[in-house]
Amino acid sequence: MSNFAVSLPEVIAVLPAAGIGSRMLVDCPKQYLTVGGKTIIEHAIFSLLHHPRIQRVIVVIHPQDTQFSRLSVAQDPRISTVYGGDQRANSVMAGLQLAGQAEWVLVHDAARPCLHLDDLSRLLSITECSQVGGILAAPVRDTMKRAEPGIQAIAHTVDRQDLWHALTPQLFPLELLKLCLSRALREGVAVTDEASALEHCGYHPILVTGRSDNIKVTRPEDLALAEFYLTQRQSLNNDSL
């Protein structure tokens, strides 16, 4: 039997949480709404910190945010905070500046409270076989329609065979993500997720199949769905004890 262990690359997580979540129609940013006994952002952070390969989580907050520092998780020594910008890409870049010499960086939405540990493990395993990185994603199951420009009328059906829903976390080499985000921002490219910045630079990140219950809370009805998933998971955990 081997007497040495393989050393896996260090991974730092960045959690952009500087948005206001206007579609939720509530007074506070959506990441501070409570679901399953904790705020959404706490669920997101704990899902990362429970994995042994995540060394640190950098939370990117709005400059006027007064709520994060009140959470108990904010006192965890593995948590750092930095102020974000007016776009997601600017906020992620701010987080990357605190990542130090980490080889890999993992970016996760603060509004995704239902990440499974096994999905995270599968994504992290690509550091052993990829130099570009990858994302959690779910194959599209529904029939997809493209609308006529500017109106809610069907133009045609889109072939779903090669379509995937992009999820988070998304995992990339730190320096590569910095390079691609910087170029995308400089060239005015709309960056809706980190993978799109790499795509703009000609890279093809891996699609790692993730669970479809890893939802992003963006609308009021998503809260009840997240509550259901988290309660169901807790019930399964209790049954296994």
From Swiss-Prot:
Pathway: Isoprenoid biosynthesis; isopentenyl diphosphate biosynthesis via DXP pathway; isopentenyl diphosphate from 1-deoxy-D-xylulose 5-phosphate: step 2/6. It comes from the Bacteria. One of its GO terms (biological process) is isopentenyl diphosphate biosynthetic process, methylerythritol 4-phosphate pathway. Catalyzes the formation of 4-diphosphocytidyl-2-C-methyl-D-erythritol from CTP and 2-C-methyl-D-erythritol 4-phosphate (MEP). The record marks R160, K216 as: Positions MEP for the nucleophilic attack. InterPro entries: IspD, IspD/TarI, IspD/TarI_cytidylyltransf_bact, ISPD_synthase_CS, Nucleotide-diphossugar_trans. GO terms for molecular function: 2-C-methyl-D-erythritol 4-phosphate cytidylyltransferase activity. This is 2-C-methyl-D-erythritol 4-phosphate cytidylyltransferase. The keyword Nucleotidyltransferase applies. Pfam families: IspD. CDD domains: CDP-ME_synthetase (cd02516). Keywords: Isoprene biosynthesis, Nucleotidyltransferase, Transferase. It comes from Yersinia pestis.
